[in-house]
């Protein structure tokens, strides 16, 4: 379930032929709406001022020697979007995917601490391009962490880092339907440390979940519950101090 490539390599774009790759919106973001760095404002004549900007007046710097318009303002067409932050956080302003979440968010609990176990409501279910982010700190001498994407009493996706299973550290993923657990998928790469902070990100894709921890891709888990709109809650439990839990669209 895991591979050895870095998150930086995986962020080369949404057209990445590697099916494990994270979308290009993470880390290598294009400029925001209207950005087009280095391009002229859309219109018939390159260098033309944006509509409504003092008709008849030349844009700054268009004619050498002409009085400068709007001192200190950048020339039209060179408004780059905000710089992308470090790691896997998308910037606001990314268009939302079609589905129940028309805006980008983030939505969820404000910065904590939050009481564990904690339930994050997912009204409308989950949809492709939905990104869930959990921040916290592993407690000293921790035994387990669990994330449960729930559909009623069923668990569509169980993500369960275990710190000491027969003296081994392992991550177990599974699905529970009609009170019966399915086949376990086990992951030996274990990025969690007792007493250390962590960031878990879960990205919903059309046919699987992707999980990254501390900005590095960890695993993916194919959907066993196909009706994603019925997954209405994320349960967070285990030996952690929970700081925040939220979701957004990318």
From Swiss-Prot:
Q: What GO biological process terms are annotated to this protein in UniProt?
A: eosinophil chemotaxis; epithelial cell differentiation; innate immune response; macrophage chemotaxis; monocyte chemotaxis; mononuclear cell migration; mRNA processing; negative regulation of endocytosis
The ranges of region (8 X 9 AA tandem repeats of Y-P-G-X(3)-P-G-A) come to 36-109
Can you say where the sequence repeats lie in this chain? 36-44, 45-53, 54-62, 63-69, 70-78, 79-88, 89-100, 101-109
Q: What does the UniProt keyword field contain?
A: Acetylation, Cytoplasm, Differentiation, Disulfide bond, IgE-binding protein, Immunity, Innate immunity, Lectin, mRNA processing, mRNA splicing, Nucleus, Phosphoprotein, Repeat, Secreted, Spliceosome
In which residue ranges is the amino acid composition biased (Low complexity)? Answer: 38-47
- Please indicate the residue ranges that the annotation assigns to the motif Nuclear export signal: 226-241
The record's section on InterPro entries has: ConA-like_dom_sf, Galectin-like, Galectin_CRD
User: Record's PROSITE patterns?
Assistant: GALECTIN
GO cellular component terms listed in the entry, alphabetical order: cell surface; collagen-containing extracellular matrix; cytoplasm; cytosol; extracellular exosome; extracellular region; extracellular space; ficolin-1-rich granule membrane
Which Pfam families would you find in this protein's record?
Answer: Gal-bind_lectin (PF00337)
Protein location:
Cytoplasm; Nucleus; Secreted
In this chain, a beta-D-galactoside is annotated as bound at 181-187
Partners and quaternary state?
Answer: Probably forms homo- or heterodimers. Interacts with DMBT1. Interacts with CD6 and ALCAM. Forms a complex with the ITGA3, ITGB1 and CSPG4. Interacts with LGALS3BP, LYPD3, ZFTRAF1 and UACA. Interacts with TRIM16; this interaction mediates autophagy of damage endomembranes. Interacts with cargo receptor TMED10; the interaction mediates the translocation from the cytoplasm into the ERGIC (endoplasmic reticulum-Golgi intermediate compartment) and thereby secretion.
Protein name as it appears in the record: Galectin-3
Species assigned in the record: Homo sapiens (Human)
Organism classification = Eukaryota, Metazoa, Chordata, Craniata, Vertebrata
Gene that encodes the chain: LGALS3
């Amino acid at each position: 379930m895991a591979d050895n490539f870095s998150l930086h390599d995986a962020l080369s774009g949404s057209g990445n032929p590697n099916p494990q790759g994270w979308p290009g919106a993470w880390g290598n973001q294009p400029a925001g709406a209207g950005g087009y760095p280095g391009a002229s404002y859309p219109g018939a004549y390159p260098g033309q001022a944006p509509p409504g900007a003092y008709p008849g007046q030349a844009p700054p710097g268009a004619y050498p020697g002409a009085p400068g318009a709007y001192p200190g303002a950048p020339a039209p067409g060179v408004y780059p979007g905000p710089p992308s932050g470090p790691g896997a956080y998308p910037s606001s302003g990314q268009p939302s995917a079609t589905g129940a979440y028309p805006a980008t968010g983030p939505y969820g609990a404000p910065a904590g601490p939050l009481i564990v176990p904690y339930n994050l409501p997912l009204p409308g279910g989950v949809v492709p391009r939905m990104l869930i982010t959990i921040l916290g700190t592993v407690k000293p001498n921790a035994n387990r962490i669990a994330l449960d994407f729930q559909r009623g009493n069923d668990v569509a996706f169980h993500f369960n880092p275990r710190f000491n299973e027969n003296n081994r550290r392992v991550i177990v993923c599974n699905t529970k339907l009609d009170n019966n657990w399915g086949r376990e998928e086990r992951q030996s790469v274990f990025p969690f440390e007792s007493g250390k902070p962590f960031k878990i990100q879960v990205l919903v894709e059309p046919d699987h979940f992707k999980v990254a921890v501390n900005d590095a891709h960890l695993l993916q888990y194919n959907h066993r519950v196909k009706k994603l709109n019925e997954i209405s809650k994320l349960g967070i439990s285990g030996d952690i101090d929970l700081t925040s839990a939220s979701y957004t669209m990318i």
